[in-house]
Amino acid sequence: SYALQDGDGQWDGIIFDLPVDATEPVIMTRGDEVTVTGLITDNDPDWTFKFGGNTRLINASVEVGSAVGEPTPAVVSCEDVHQIADEVESYEGVLVQLNNVTVSAVNDYDWAITDETGFEALLDDDMANMAADNMMSLLSEGDVLDQVMGVFNYSFGTYKIQIRDVADLGTTM
């Protein structure tokens, strides 16, 4: 899956996949400007278990343009992206950043974080590279990070921030 973002706020991102039977491989790099066409859906039967009701673009075709750099993350709070927030779906596919967070719980699949709002949000490593995955495995309850950043998505029944690399994890304070 790929995350596509046009802007830096709510409703500016989407998750998409390239068709499995694509004849020409498409090579995209983070920060590339792309033109994508496809079908918007909230229910893709091929992805029900993993992505459930995630708004997705399917049967996508992609034209890669020039490198323009990564989008600016939407700075949000745990209150904005907790599981039952009023507009939580509006951040799907958007690069989000949360500042001054505390790891509040660790389990086998994800990490819960809180901030000054008192709400809890989830971090996940499904999109993480090996270095980020290793760093996340060292996080413990009570650790404080100056910021976390990642692509916001819905998978396996929960909304979460998908960490991509070590830079997304900020500094432990």
Question: What residues fall within each predicted segment?
Answer:
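Extended non-catalytic accessory segments flanking core domains
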Residues: 1-173
